């Protein structure tokens, strides 16, 4: 698995925190100092923390587990969708719906409704309706796409959350904590790291920084999935070898 280097993080501006007057004292140990009233994050902490989180992600993916990518603020939304799609993982990149995890039964009903509308739009059902009815159903489908389109194939609760900006996504983190779902989170100098199992101290606003985190997590997912596929091949080969040995033994008898 490829690891992220300090050079990668420096180029992306991961070390630039928030203005010193907005800091959260709980992030004290991750702060190197200040420059022009901006806190500087100590990347000596960020590099091992990020790579530790990536190993955790890779191990989960190898077991075919699901990592839910969460980033609903404007700077993160597009990147989160692209990287989650690339890794074949679920995502939430618009508004987090309260109860998305803790009330998943209700969310599942919405997913079912969304799938029904998708089917109807493709099988000719919409062609039999009035323009007004089609317009209303399309609006409903668009609304569902924005809110749950990224989790329609999740198939149940995720096994971990990967979160950009833990303060902005506090509701998601609280729901995950309540259910015992591990949280991997990018935590800036103004944020509260409580409730985050894998704290990645770093800038959570710069698009280049968000791209580095999301790409690294997606790459780790793909690495884990490819390892799982490789192990599956080995298992098949071992079984085939055992079958051949049994066949040879039977013939010799």
From Swiss-Prot:
Record key words, sorted: Ribonucleoprotein, Ribosomal protein
CDD domains named among the record's database cross-references: RPS2
Keyword Zinc listed: no
Pfam family, one: Ribosomal_S2
Any one annotated GO CC term: cytosolic small ribosomal subunit
Protein's name according to its UniProt entry: Small ribosomal subunit protein uS2
Signal sequence bounds: none
Entries under SUPFAM superfamilies matching the protein: Ribosomal protein S2 (SSF52313)
Source organism, top-level taxon: Bacteria
Molecular function (Gene Ontology), one example: structural constituent of ribosome
Entry similarity comment: Belongs to the universal ribosomal protein uS2 family.
């Amino acid at each position: 698995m490829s690891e992220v280097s300090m050079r990668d993080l420096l180029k992306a501006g991961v070390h630039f925190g928030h203005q010193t007057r907005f800091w959260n004292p709980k992030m004290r140990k991750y702060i190197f100092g200040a420059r022009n009233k901006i806190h500087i994050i100590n990347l000596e902490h960020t590099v091992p923390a990020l790579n530790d989180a990536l190993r955790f992600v890779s191990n989960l993916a190898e077991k075919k587990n699901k990592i839910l990518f969460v980033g609903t603020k404007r700077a993160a939304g597009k990147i989160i969708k692209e990287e989650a799609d690339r890794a074949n993982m679920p995502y939430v990149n618009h508004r987090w719906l309260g109860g998305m995890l803790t009330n998943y039964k209700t969310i599942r009903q919405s997913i079912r409704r969304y799938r029904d509308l998708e089917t109807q739009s493709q099988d000719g059902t919409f062609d039999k309706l009035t323009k007004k009815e089609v317009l209303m159903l399309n609006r409903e489908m668009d609304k569902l796409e924005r809110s749950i389109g990224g989790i329609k194939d999740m198939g149940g609760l995720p096994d971990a959350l990967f979160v950009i900006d833990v303060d902005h996504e506090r509701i998601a983190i609280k729901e995950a904590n309540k259910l015992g779902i591990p949280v991997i989170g990018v935590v800036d100098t103004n944020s509260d790291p409580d409730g985050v199992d894998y704290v990645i101290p770093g800038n959570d606003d710069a698009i280049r920084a968000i791209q580095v985190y999301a790409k690294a997590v997606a790459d780790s997912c793909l690495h884990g999935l490819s390892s799982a596929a490789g192990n599956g091949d080995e298992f098949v080969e071992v079984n085939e070898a055992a079958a051949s040995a049994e066949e040879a033994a039977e013939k010799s008898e």
